[in-house]
Design a protein with these regions (language model features):
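Conserved active-site regions of diverse hydrolases
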Residues: 2-370
Length: 370
């Protein structure tokens, strides 16, 4: 009966996930995820309490959920697709139930605006970041949760067993470390100076991976950063009437994509070192940059029109003339766009990226190879 139940679940999942590869029953029992707005499923909105937030209202959530859920997207985000591929319910955000929740299928610690490095790191550069909930803070929440999930585990055996059955998603993280420098910079903060942050950010991500392995994690997904030179908010902010030579053959900002590539090369090297140091762990390097560039290079293949404009926003060449909120213009069916609100991607784009990570086109090894 167990085999037939599993096969039945796989068939249902294949229908629900459209073109995603079928899931694997029992591959992982839970997912724990860390990161920023790319995978936040409600922590930021919870932190805002009764305050106003555009993420609490439509058109956010309009596609799949038909209402706002705290996801900064028109529908599902990457962690949702990974959970469904492994026959798990959608992973809940940590903060709404952090004191009482049992989280049988895992928890999502990601918070919009989170950085990899703690805010104190940037004070030496006379720079500040707006959110204090960096990667280290999120891992601290995770450790507190583990103590609740495995009380009295003096030797750590219960926690190790729990984590051995779990997938850890470490990001994407680090993107905001660079975003806040680029977006809020001035003459005293030239963009080139951000290159100095790359070694420290990558090393911090690496030490976080090692810390999680020390706790008992055995399967960790480590994504790289997106091609920020193709993001509408960057294009509207940094191109304008600049030299056309600033754009590459895809009409993305050459310097910023080169910068993302430098970060990603350093991260891939760090993941290689971590693999050599931890042969018993499965460390999966996910190429979000490469997967996202497929949408830019071959938009028609995925039913995308112009991949460099936002679906929700205002006027202007990149639809970034106004913020995406309940008064904004939705320029069409989000499934025909790669970008949702000028910064974050659409459910359709995340589905394409997830498929590439699950089947291995943009992951080493494939996420579904568990």
């Amino acid at each position: 009966m167990g085999i037939f139940k599993c096969l039945s679940a796989l068939l249902v999942s294949a229908v629900l996930l459209l073109n995603l590869p079928p899931g694997l029953c029992g591959c992982y029992k839970r997912i724990f995820s860390f990161g920023d707005s790319i995978i936040d499923t409600g922590n930021f909105v919870h932190m805002s309490g009764n305050g106003s937030s555009r993420y609490k209202e439509l058109p956010y959530g309009m596609t799949f959920f038909k209402n706002a859920t705290g996801r900064i997207c028109d529908g599902r985000v990457l962690v949702d697709f990974y959970a469904q591929a492994f026959q798990l319910p959608m992973i809940p955000p940590n903060l709404p139930e952090q004191d009482s929740g049992r989280f049988p299928n895992g928890a999502n610690f990601a918070v919009a605006g989170a950085t990899a490095m703690p805010p104190a790191y940037y004070r030496r550069w006379n720079h500040s970041v707006p959110m204090p909930h960096s990667l280290g803070v999120q891992i601290g929440w995770f450790k507190e949760m583990l103590q609740r999930l495995a009380p009295g585990d003096d030797d750590g055996a219960k926690i190790r067993q729990l984590l051995n059955e779990s997938l850890i998603m470490l990001g994407e993280i680090g993107g905001n470390d660079y975003n806040f420098w680029f977006w809020f910079g001035d003459a005293a903060k030239p963009r080139e100076q951000a290159n100095q942050f790359i070694p420290d950010i990558v090393a911090y991500i690496g030490s976080s991976v090692q810390e999680l392995i020390g706790l008992g994690a055995r399967s960790i997904l480590i994504p790289n950063n997106f091609p920020i030179g193709c993001v509408p908010s960057y294009l509207s902010m940094f191109f304008g009437s600049s030299n056309p030579a600033d754009l590459d053959e895809h009409r993305c900002l050459r310097w910023f994509n080169d910068f993302s590539t430098r970060h990603n090369q350093a991260l891939r090297g760090e993941v290689g070192r971590l693999k050599a140091r931890n042969p018993g762990a499965k460390l999966i390097y996910a190429d979000y940059y490469g997967a996202a560039m497929e949408l830019v290079k071959h938009p028609g293949r995925f039913g995308i029109g112009n991949p460099l404009v936002a679906c929700c926003g205002g006027g202007g060449p990149y639809h970034t003339g106004a913020a995406c909120d309940r008064t904004a213009k939705v320029w069409g069916d989000p499934s025909g766009f790669a970008n949702w609100d000028g910064v974050h991607m659409t459910e359709k784009a995340y589905q394409v990226i997830a498929q590439g990570v699950l089947n291995g086109t943009f992951a080493d090894p494939p996420l579904l190879s568990c």
